[in-house]
Every structure is written in structure tokens, then in C-alpha cells.
Amino acid sequence: MQSPAVLVTSRRLQNAHTGLDLTVPQHQEVRGKMMSGHVEYQILVVTRLAAFKSAKHRPEDVVQFLVSKKYSEIEEFYQKLSSRYAAASLPPLPRKVLFVGESDIRERRAVFNEILRCVSKDAELAGSPELLEFLGTRSPGAAGLTSRDSSVLDGTDSQTGNDEEAFDFFEEQDQVAEEGPPVQSLKGEDAEESLEEEEALDPLGIMRSKKPKKHPKVAVKAKPSPRLTIFDEEVDPDEGLFGPGRKLSPQDPSEDVSSVDPLKLFDDPDLGGAIPLGDSLLLPAACESGGPTPSLSHRDASKELFRVEEDLDQILNLGAEPKPKPQLKPKPPVAAKPVIPRKPAVPPKAGPAEAVAGQQKPQEQIQAMDEMDILQYIQDHDTPAQAAPSLF
């Protein structure tokens, strides 16, 4: 905690018997991160007591300094005085409210002013160690002058008529805001003080919590890239990636000739140089033809690509593959109709003379037959008997 700035003043003490005057002339709102913040009440101390002076001050000098305290700190100091000095009659503390408004802050400042006036009038309370601790006199001497404290002190001196040390309080605050806080390097004791705990209070100034200070992280600035003027050409890293295709010429392999096709993205594969026409690696049909087979020109290919069918049935059937017709089963063969055996014809009845002549003819033929005729007769008459009769 930084010690208050102690300045010599020419104002007259109102409490000469105690040598101490305590007032609360104003308050200040301190904004924190996000929606947090608290109110500090500035206590003006005017005294000639040696406990508040440094070695450079004379015994008869009257000094003044400013101390900023929060509601919770003033409440703690009030409870200490009430518990130790029960005989002292002090005004009651202002009531606690959930939401603190401007009227509540003004009411608290007025009550704190009355309480500290009563403390400064009482000789026992004015020299109590609780008051010395509350006003921060454990570390004697002033270790620096803050712009806020000095401006308030000089503003109070201007009311007493001291023109040499008086200046405008609000003008000094504006100058400090424009100049900004000075940058100090943490060395030695400053490095140890940065490790101390700082107090974080709620917006009402009631609850207190301690948290360690965080070291500010030094951001490493990236090296800015050189700015290009209007005459400099920016190098495109992908310039050669999408350039026109290039291929080797059969006449001179060392020369690169740009391809005719502007849509080609990649170079032709390198096959080890151009191949002569009569090389044995080529197919015989290719050697005889003497050149590549003619292909469709670019315009014919475009016409074929953008051709639109006029027949609606053909357009609908473009994506569908023709289904093969199912093969018809062969009809079973029709069986032939069975041959109806014919009735043997009845020979006409012959007379007795004809019958006798007819009987004599076969007998003569039988007698005239030899062995071969008999065998042939048996074969002719035996074959139909062995064949199975067909139902169809």
C-alpha cells in the first residue's frame, strides 16, 4: 500500500486540544472490470501530531494528507472502536442496502464525516492505535505523491488563501488523464510488492476477497511485412500451378512449345524423349498407318455433347437399359395319331372250280421253293410279330 502524501499546510486546526481534524469532503467511484466497482470515501487529515510527520518536518508544522477508504474498511474501524471504547458515543453507521444509489452514497459520506469528527474531538480516540492503523501511519514518511491526492490537498489549501500551493483540482485531473500513467520498471522491492495480494470488492463495498496479482504478459509483436507500392508486383506463389500445358516437340526435344489446348492443367508425362516413327516398339499397324488415327474435332465433339433429343420417348429411355425379351418355351412335340388298322378285305367267293385251282397254285409254289426262299419267308413274317404295337 502506498503511503499518503504528507504536505505542509497553513490552515488552522479546529481541534487544538487533540491536534487532529478529520473530515470526509468527497467520494469517488472506482470502476472495475465488467460490471464490478466500488466507492471510495476520501478522508482529509489535518494534524500537528508527530506520528503523522516525517523527519523533514518541523515540530510546529501543520501537515495534511488524504486517505481513501471503502465502506467495508470504515465499518471494520467503527466496530473496533465500539468494542474497545464502549464509553465513546459515536453516531450509528448508515444502513446497508442491496442496491446503492447516489442518495445512499451521499448519506453515507455525511454519516462518515460526523463519525470522524467525533473521533477527532475525543482525545482518547484521537491517539488510539486503531486510528493510527486506520490512517496508515505504520510506514512513516511519504513514498511518493499521487496526482489524485495532491490535487485534492491543493484544492483544500486554495480555500484557506495559500496562493503559492493552490491550483485547479479539475484541471490537474484532466492533465493526468491526458498524460496517462507513468511506466515503471519492477526492480528490487517493486518486484516483491507485485507478488502481494490485492483486494477485490463487490460493487456494494461490503464483501472482501483476496487474490494474487497477475504479472502482465508482454505481447510479442510480429514483424510487419514490407509494404508494396503501386509499382511493385506481388509474386503469386500459385502462378505456375494453373498455367497452360507444355509438351516436347518431336523436331527439337530441348524446346518447349506451348500446348494448343488452353484448358490443360498439367504437363504431359516425360517418356524419355520423342520416339521415331519406325521404332520397333511401336505396333506394326501404327507404323503402316504413319500417324495417329483421326479423332473428332473439337467442334464435332461439342455438337455431340450438346445434342438434344427431340423424341420424348427417347429422352425418357436414355438412362434405362433395354431389357432382354424373355425366351419363349418351345412347344412340346405333338404325338402322331395312331394308325387305325384296316380291316382285311374279304376275298370274293369263288366257285368250286376256281377254289380247287387256287389251292393247287400254292402247293405248286411251295414245292418249287428251295431253302433260301423258305428262310426269306420266315424273316418276312417274323419281323412284324416282334415289333411292339404303338398306342399312337
From Swiss-Prot:
Residues bearing the modification N6-acetyllysine: K337
Annotated Gene Ontology cellular component terms: endoplasmic reticulum; mitochondrion
InterPro entries membership: HS1BP3, HS1BP3_PX, PX_dom, PX_dom_sf
Ranges where the PX domain occurs: 19-142
One of the record's GO molecular function terms: phosphatidylinositol binding
Span list, region Disordered: 138-162, 174-265, 319-364
Phosphoserine PTM sites in chain numbering: S3, S139, S194, S249
Record-level GO BP terms: regulation of apoptotic process
PROSITE patterns reported for this sequence: PX
Compositionally biased intervals (Pro residues): 325-335
Modified-residue entries (N-acetylmethionine), positions: M1
Acidic residues composition bias: residue spans: 190-201
Protein's UniProt keywords contain Nucleotide-binding: no
Lineage: superkingdom: Eukaryota
Annotated Basic residues bias: 208-220
Gene3D superfamilies assigned: Phox-like domain (3.30.1520.10)
Keywords carried by this UniProt record: Acetylation, Phosphoprotein
Its job: May be a modulator of IL-2 signaling.
Assembly: Binds HCLS1. Interacts with the SH3 domain of HCLS1 in vitro.
Protein name: HCLS1-binding protein 3
Lineage of the organism: Eukaryota, Metazoa, Chordata, Craniata, Vertebrata
